[in-house]
Amino acid sequence: MADRSVRPLRHLVHAVTGGQPPSEAQVRQAAWIARCVGRGGSAPLHRDDVSALAETLQVKEFAPGAVVFHADQTADGVWIVRHGLIELAVGSRRRRAVVNILHPGDVDGDIPLLLEMPMVYTGRALTQATCLFLDRQAFERLLATHPAIARRWLSSVAQRVSTAQIRLMGMLGRPLPAQVAQLLLDEAIDARIELAQRTLAAMLGAQRPSINKILKEFERDRLITVGYAVIEITDQHGLRARAQ
């Protein structure tokens, strides 16, 4: 049942990318699944909910570099970032690729838990971090005893998966520069994109040199500035025009 539930999203990713070597496919799948993290308006829990669940939520502290959860391990609960930053990455050493950064208020682990999927990336603390953890039993009890929260949580999951699918479909048939511009706009938090070029290339099913060339063109036109594993948008209106 769980495998059938996630198959449409996997097929959609394959259709957009055309299928690539396993390592790049792994980065791509993890990156797009990481787009389904609960964030901002799509987060399933409100501030009042977290306060009401104080006795249920476990507080866990992580030093910089500490592993929060491992790729391929069975999802055993839901993580809510309280303080600090959590890096989501696949691979190791030189093959390692960062696919997302969790910020305070972000929620992860709920979709793999509901679908009985393993985690597809490793979460590691970038800074001193505090997370709230809701284990499987507590999560199931929460959904069973708080109908309003259960409805909002299911709506949140549906919204996140739908948004990810719409983004993927929106890439079809567009020139690569327009795809890159749109991806940067979608991924920006406070005008910053904290992803390596390899991850951006994998998400679009493109070669890294092609992405690098486009980013240099954008930088030359003063739309962005490019640093190590970070891109800053300096002209949002101009970049949005390139995405059309």
From Swiss-Prot:
For the keyword Iron-sulfur, the answer is no
**Sorted UniProt keywords:** Activator, DNA-binding, Transcription, Transcription regulation
Where does the HTH crp-type domain lie? 174-237
Query: Gene3D superfamilies this protein is in?
Result: Jelly Rolls, Winged helix-like DNA-binding domain superfamily/Winged helix DNA-binding domain
Q: Name one GO molecular function term.
A: DNA-binding transcription factor activity
Q: Which residues form the signal peptide?
A: none
Record-annotated DNA-binding residue ranges: 197-216
Residues involved in a nucleoside 3',5'-cyclic phosphate binding: 41-160
- Transcription regulation as a keyword of this entry, yes or no, is yes
Gene Ontology, cellular component aspect: cytosol
SUPFAM superfamilies xrefs = cAMP-binding domain-like, Winged helix' DNA-binding domain
One Pfam family this sequence matches: HTH_Crp_2
Q: Which GO terms describe its biological process?
A: regulation of DNA-templated transcription
* Functional note: Positively regulates the expression of at least groEL2. Cyclic AMP does not affect transcription in vitro.
Q: What is this protein called?
A: HTH-type transcriptional regulator Cmr
Q: Which organism is it from?
A: Mycobacterium tuberculosis (strain ATCC 25618 / H37Rv)
Upper taxonomic lineage: Bacteria, Bacillati, Actinomycetota, Actinomycetes, Mycobacteriales
